[in-house]
Amino acid sequence: MENFICKIANEEEMKIKWDYEIEISDNKSNWIIWKDENIDRFKKGLIIPYYGLLDGKIICEATAMLNSEIVQNSDGLVGNGVVYLSAFRTNKEYQGKGYFSKLFKFMIEDLKEKGYEKVTLGVEPEEIKNKKIYNHYGFNEHIKNSKEVYPDGTEIEVEYYGKSLK
């Protein structure tokens, strides 16, 4: 892990990572929209993209969403010292090696330093592995269940959880 660094991404790094996600995706249309939305949100200061780089290559990411207007079902998930986390992704060949855990700790410390008191996230009910990981990270407070809609109209069920940073 000595060549692994955690950082807040810049716009150029975001473009590289989003292009990678588009390239490996089966449904490119959603990913193209999400790329444009997130780069615009970054420019407006509405998100903080956290990246993990190994030997200069982006291998994992997470995004803190700071504004209720950009989070679906945002009531109780973002605002007043609460930030919504999304886009937890690690390139397949680096999964299970502790890289994302290091990035997650970096992100949480940065958000604490910025004054946030709670973080929230959403997970699909059938994503049992992810739910166990999030529980391990301390997301034990069930907030609510709801539906989210992708740009192409696909609806998904989502369970929302919170973690105190105090």
Write out the residue ranges for each language-model feature.
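Conserved active-site alpha-helix within GNAT-family acetyltransferase domains
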Residues: 101, 126-143
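Short hydrophobic/aromatic beta-strand or adjacent loop that forms the aromatic wall/cage
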Residues: 47, 155-162
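Active-site acidic-Proline motif in GNAT/NAT acetyltransferases
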Residues: 91-93, 97, 125-126
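Conserved beta-strand-loop-alpha-helix junction that forms the acyl-donor binding cleft
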Residues: 121-131, 148-152
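Conserved N-terminal entry element of GNAT/NAT acetyltransferase domains
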Residues: 1-18, 165-166
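Conserved GNAT acetyl-CoA-binding A-motif
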Residues: 111-123
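Acetyl-CoA-dependent GNAT
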Residues: 8-11, 19-87, 91-93, 104, ...
